[in-house]
Amino acid sequence: MAIKIKVEFLGGLDIISNSVREHKCVIPFEEGEATVADLITYITKNIISDPKDIPVFIEDGTVRPGILVLINDTDWELEGMEEYVIESGDVFTFTSTLHGG
């Protein structure tokens, strides 16, 4: 069995995934086993198209500062951050809040 979720990259962050904003993913975990930490690993291995772009998304093993993370439209800090247990149907939105100028 696997978990079906949606991952979105907004605010220019889609550049790390060949300019694809929305990804429907089937992650190879049983319901109740996978956490956001597992999802971050999945994203770095399966969605980020160029390994050189991983530092754009990850810093010190987690999502880098300046990226807003929402789980089902709720700030991930309210949901337990990396420890949140993923459920089928969840939507994860990663939005860059940093802009050049």
Swiss-Prot record:
<feature type="modified residue" description="1-thioglycine">
    <location>
        <position position="101"/>
    </location>
</feature>
<feature type="cross-link" description="Glycyl lysine isopeptide (Gly-Lys) (interchain with K-? in acceptor proteins)">
    <location>
        <position position="101"/>
    </location>
</feature>
<dbReference type="GO" id="GO:0031386">
    <property type="term" value="F:protein tag activity"/>
</dbReference>
<dbReference type="GO" id="GO:0097163">
    <property type="term" value="F:sulfur carrier activity"/>
</dbReference>
<keyword id="KW-0819">tRNA processing</keyword>
<dbReference type="InterPro" id="IPR015221">
    <property type="entry name" value="Urm1"/>
</dbReference>
<comment type="pathway">
    <text>tRNA modification; 5-methoxycarbonylmethyl-2-thiouridine-tRNA biosynthesis.</text>
</comment>
<comment type="function">
    <text>Acts as a sulfur carrier required for 2-thiolation of mcm(5)S(2)U at tRNA wobble positions of cytosolic tRNA(Lys), tRNA(Glu) and tRNA(Gln). Serves as sulfur donor in tRNA 2-thiolation reaction by being thiocarboxylated (-COSH) at its C-terminus by the MOCS3 homolog UBA4. The sulfur is then transferred to tRNA to form 2-thiolation of mcm(5)S(2)U. Prior mcm(5) tRNA modification by the elongator complex is required for 2-thiolation. Also acts as a ubiquitin-like protein (UBL) that is covalently conjugated via an isopeptide bond to lysine residues of target proteins such as AHP1.</text>
</comment>
<dbReference type="InterPro" id="IPR012675">
    <property type="entry name" value="Beta-grasp_dom_sf"/>
</dbReference>
<dbReference type="GO" id="GO:0032447">
    <property type="term" value="P:protein urmylation"/>
</dbReference>
<dbReference type="GO" id="GO:0005829">
    <property type="term" value="C:cytosol"/>
</dbReference>
<dbReference type="InterPro" id="IPR016155">
    <property type="entry name" value="Mopterin_synth/thiamin_S_b"/>
</dbReference>
<protein>
    <recommendedName>
        <fullName>Ubiquitin-related modifier 1</fullName>
    </recommendedName>
</protein>
<dbReference type="Pfam" id="PF09138">
    <property type="entry name" value="Urm1"/>
</dbReference>
<dbReference type="GO" id="GO:0034599">
    <property type="term" value="P:cellular response to oxidative stress"/>
</dbReference>
<dbReference type="GO" id="GO:0042803">
    <property type="term" value="F:protein homodimerization activity"/>
</dbReference>
<keyword id="KW-0963">Cytoplasm</keyword>
<dbReference type="GO" id="GO:0002143">
    <property type="term" value="P:tRNA wobble position uridine thiolation"/>
</dbReference>
<keyword id="KW-1017">Isopeptide bond</keyword>
<dbReference type="GO" id="GO:0005634">
    <property type="term" value="C:nucleus"/>
</dbReference>
<keyword id="KW-0833">Ubl conjugation pathway</keyword>
<dbReference type="GO" id="GO:0001403">
    <property type="term" value="P:invasive growth in response to glucose limitation"/>
</dbReference>
<dbReference type="GO" id="GO:0007114">
    <property type="term" value="P:cell budding"/>
</dbReference>
<comment type="similarity">
    <text>Belongs to the URM1 family.</text>
</comment>
